[in-house]
Structures are given as C-alpha cells and as structure tokens.
C-alpha cells in the first residue's frame, strides 16, 4: 500500500466524523465521545491498526463467560478487520484492536469499519466495567454474545 491509501482512508474517516485527522509520523489519535482511539500505520505502510483502551485491568474475579469471550476474540487476528483483545503485561491495561488492509482501507469501507470497531470497543468497555463493579455476591453480568454480535454486525464479510 502506498502512503496515499492510508492518507485517503484517514481522510474518509475525517470527513465521516467531521474532525480534522492527520497522521503524526505514523499515528493519529481521535476521540469518539469520551473514548480515545489510536490509528497507526504499520512499518510496511500496508495496514492500519486501530486500537482503544477498554479497561485498566481485568476484573478481580472475571466470570468464566467473560474469560471465554475474551479468549474467543483472539481469533480476530486471523481475519482482516476483526477485533481482538490484548493485555499489556506491564500495565495490565486491556486494549481492543483491529488490523485493516487492502479493500478495507477504501472509502466507505474504512469509516464504516471504524464505526463498527468503535461501537464494539464501547460495548466491551461497558461489559468489563459492569463485571468489575459487580460484587462477588451478585451474579456476573451475562454476555450479550459480544463476539457473535461483532461477527453478525458486518465485521467479517461472509
């Protein structure tokens, strides 16, 4: 991918959000509501990596369902544009991220995919916060099947 493609993808997102966006070196930060997102070009310049902090750490006693759902999200790395979740071993922060390449970087694909990713990241952040805030005597909030919802909402072309 030439730098023009990543610039065009960011310009399309900028127009969609009504915000002035530009890469500073190889990254761009954007706030959607109160959620910060990072958009970074990879070293080869042929992919964009979008990420968002979704929690400061795992809940103290995560439910089995939450752990299963987070592990299932690891398969996102196998598909262009499908979100995954990772934990920073130094800080404990949980981040959602997705990698976009090729046809996913042209308008309107990238702005559409970014909006879906932003909605996914917010739902995941809300779910993690709800589980963190649930007392041990209360049942943990059940999943709204975040991973399935993500798949059925168009993250993956079927």
Predicted feature locations:
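Hydrophobic residues embedded in beta-strands of well-ordered beta-sheets
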Residues: 28, 46-48, 92-94
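A short acidic-to-branched-hydrophobic micro-motif
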Residues: 41, 46-56
């Amino acid at each position: 991918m030439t730098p023009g493609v990543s610039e065009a993808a960011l310009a399309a997102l900028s127009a969609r959000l009504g915000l002035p966006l530009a890469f500073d070196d190889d990254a761009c930060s954007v706030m959607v509501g109160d959620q910060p997102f990072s958009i970074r070009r990879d070293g080869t310049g042929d992919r964009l990596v979008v990420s968002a902090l979704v929690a400061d750490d795992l809940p103290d006693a995560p439910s089995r369902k939450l752990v299963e759902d987070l592990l299932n999200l690891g398969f996102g790395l196998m598909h262009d544009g499908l979100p995954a979740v990772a934990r920073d071993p130094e800080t404990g922060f949980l981040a959602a991220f997705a990698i976009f390449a090729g046809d996913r970087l042209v308008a309107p694909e990238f702005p559409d995919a970014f909006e879906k990713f932003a909605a996914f990241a917010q739902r995941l952040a809300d779910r993690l916060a709800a589980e963190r805030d649930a007392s041990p005597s209360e049942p943990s909030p059940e999943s709204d099947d975040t991973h399935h919802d993500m798949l059925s909402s168009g993250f993956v072309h079927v």
